[in-house]
């Protein structure tokens, strides 16, 4: 178990960091959480995801997994591994898509040799919890049932990291590894984000009230399916975590690592200085993220050889 600290050094990632910072500095059109602001956010997030180039030699196909839409990415030559990656995109539960994240999914498929399924869960606020969570859960159950000899790795960023951790807790018997990029794990406003991000409006205002209307609905924010902060970390599959040093969700990422350490779960964490939230999903587009991609793919493969799922 270890926490590895790295710095942004390449012009490629430096430029992307500056671009993200400039975008975040712009005022939001409409009251945040309004229909207009959500549409603007969806456009902006989709544009960012689509800016990541698709990996060569990877094909895509639309599939259905127990009624849940997904996009399968696999190499033209066919997968070289029986194992499966399930990628769940981020976007604050209200934006992003499997279609927009083909660049990152294709990098996962090419580097790992695994079939990579990107889940096209239904966004909020069109639906509220637990619709999207259950869609992801049903997809995992379908893949596990149809592929009994395959290890399944969950990869998620931000809101997708929330889903991935909560799903791994729910299906410890079916998940062999979890890779989390800047996960958000607490909507009960219990975790101390101000400790690491004292100037962040998100840390100051909390997430509970905002997401109560947009995602949580009338459910308890301390439900582990909503806030895996409150979940059961015992016997969790091995976890690899990435985040930026100065982002507001650093506290969330660190908490997951420390809980893994407490329960003796195999875990690694990479903290980047000078990047941005969920920077790892840039994939092969920068030297730092390409190296990181190789690191967590190697972690996954090592885990899949040594980690035995309890039957």
Predicted regions and their residues:
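Alpha/beta-hydrolase superfamily serine-hydrolase fold, recognizing
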Residues: 28, 65-71, 76-311
């Amino acid at each position: 178990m270890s926490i590895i600290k790295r710095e942004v050094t390449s012009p490629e990632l430096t430029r992307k960091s500056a671009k993200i910072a400039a975008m975040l500095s712009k005022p939001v059109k409409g009251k945040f959480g309004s229909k207009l602001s959500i549409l603007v956010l969806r456009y902006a997030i989709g544009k960012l995801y689509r800016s990541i180039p698709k990996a060569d030699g990877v094909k895509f196909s639309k599939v259905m997994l127990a009624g849940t839409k997904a996009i399968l990415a696999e190499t033209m030559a066919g997968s070289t591994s029986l194992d499966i990656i399930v990628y769940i995109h981020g976007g604050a539960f209200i934006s992003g898509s499997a279609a927009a994240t083909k660049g990152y999914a294709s990098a996962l498929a090419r580097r790992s040799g695994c079939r990579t399924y990107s889940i096209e869960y239904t966004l909020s606020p069109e639906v509220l919890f637990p619709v999207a969570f259950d869609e992801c859960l049903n997809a995992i159950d379908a893949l596990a049932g149809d592929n009994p000899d395959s290890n399944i790795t969950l990869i998620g960023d931000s809101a997708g990291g929330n889903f991935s951790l909560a799903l791994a807790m729910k299906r410890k018997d079916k998940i062999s590894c979890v890779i989390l990029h800047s996960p958000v794990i607490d909507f009960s406003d219990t975790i101390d984000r101000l400790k690491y991000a004292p100037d962040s409006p998100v840390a100051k205002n909390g997430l509970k009230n905002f997401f109560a209307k947009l995602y949580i609905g009338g459910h308890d924010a301390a439900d582990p399916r909503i806030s895996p902060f409150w979940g059961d970390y015992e016997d969790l599959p091995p976890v690899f975590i990435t985040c930026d040093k100065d982002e507001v969700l650093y506290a969330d990422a660190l908490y997951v690592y420390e809980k893994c350490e407490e329960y003796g779960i195999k875990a690694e964490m990479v903290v980047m200085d000078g990047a941005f939230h969920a920077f790892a999903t840039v994939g092969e587009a920068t030297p730092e993220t390409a190296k990181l991609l190789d690191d967590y793919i190697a972690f996954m493969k090592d885990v899949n050889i040594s980690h035995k799922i309890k039957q």
